[in-house]
């Protein structure tokens, strides 16, 4: 098996535009054969997805999903570069998949970690810094532990960081990149809204014992 060097990874990345981790995995899967690694990335729909990510995606579609029982609903905007692609089967399939993903993730509030407001990040940091299990630890160690916990917590809030519900071996971000590679355009999840039936409505709690008593009187 060939040694996978940093230069080999860089060469593959330059050829395909794929991410560093994807290039490393491709080379590992193909025993360091760069030609086969390019084919592997193309089969996965990853090759050139990174290069496309800088292009303007102003077209697309707004999708909706209503979960069984009509208790959860989702609206989502998915962007691409051309109206032709937006009407295509691959793009529409991705739109459905990501809509279902949002419905299945009640704790997700943002598209990406970078979208999370600074005040939310600071609030999470303050909560973690005040944990009892960190009391007495050196400041440097405490900071490192908190950074790890915060990173994990912020990923829980970001849609593209979630394991894909139909294939937990990839994230939503990787799924989007795969489809972008397959259709040859930049694809982005722009925004979404998740609705839960009765959310935010205060329901008056009834006195069950009193109800039973009144029925028997």
From Swiss-Prot:
Annotated family: Belongs to the EF-Ts family.
GO MF term list: translation elongation factor activity
Covalent S-S links between cysteines: none
UniProt KW Membrane keyword: no
Annotated localization: Cytoplasm
Organism the protein comes from: Prochlorococcus marinus (strain SARG / CCMP1375 / SS120)
InterPro entries tied to this protein: EF-Ts_dimer_sf, Transl_elong_EFTs/EF1B, Transl_elong_EFTs/EF1B_dimer, Transl_elong_Ts_CS, UBA-like_sf
Taxon lineage: Bacteria, Bacillati, Cyanobacteriota, Cyanophyceae, Synechococcales
Keyword annotations: Cytoplasm, Elongation factor, Protein biosynthesis
Pfam families documented for this protein: EF_TS
PROSITE patterns linked to this entry: EF_TS_1, EF_TS_2
Transmembrane segments: none
Protein name: Elongation factor Ts
Involved in Mg(2+) ion dislocation from EF-Tu as annotated region, ranges: 82-85
Domain of life: Bacteria
Entry coiled-coil feature ranges: none
A cellular-component GO term for this protein: cytoplasm
Role of this protein: Associates with the EF-Tu.GDP complex and induces the exchange of GDP to GTP. It remains bound to the aminoacyl-tRNA.EF-Tu.GTP complex up to the GTP hydrolysis stage on the ribosome.
Alphabetized CDD domains for the sequence: UBA_EF-Ts
Predominant location: cytoplasm
């Amino acid at each position: 098996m060939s040694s996978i060097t940093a230069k080999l990874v860089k060469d593959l990345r330059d050829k395909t535009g794929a991410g560093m981790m994807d290039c490393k995995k491709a080379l590992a899967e193909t025993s360091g054969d760069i030609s086969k690694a390019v084919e592997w990335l193309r089969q996965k729909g990853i090759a050139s997805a990174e290069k496309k990510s800088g292009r303007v995606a102003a077209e697309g579609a707004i999708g909706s999903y209503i979960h069984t029982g009509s208790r959860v609903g989702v609206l989502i905007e998915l962007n691409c570069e051309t109206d032709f692609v937006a009407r295509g089967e691959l793009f529409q399939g991705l739109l459905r998949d990501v809509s279902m993903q949002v419905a299945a993730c009640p704790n997700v509030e943002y598209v990406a970690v970078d979208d999370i407001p600074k005040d939310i990040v600071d609030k999470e940091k303050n909560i973690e810094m005040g944990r009892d299990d960190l009391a007495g630890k050196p400041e440097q160690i405490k900071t490192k532990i908190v950074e790890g916990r915060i990173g994990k917590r912020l990923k829980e809030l970001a849609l593209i960081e979630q394991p894909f519900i139909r294939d937990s071996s990839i994230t939503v971000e990787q799924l989007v990149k795969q489809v972008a590679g397959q259709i040859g355009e930049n694809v982005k999840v722009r925004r979404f809204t998740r609705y839960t039936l009765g959310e935010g409505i205060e329901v008056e709690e009834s006195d069950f014992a009193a109800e039973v008593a009144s029925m028997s009187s």
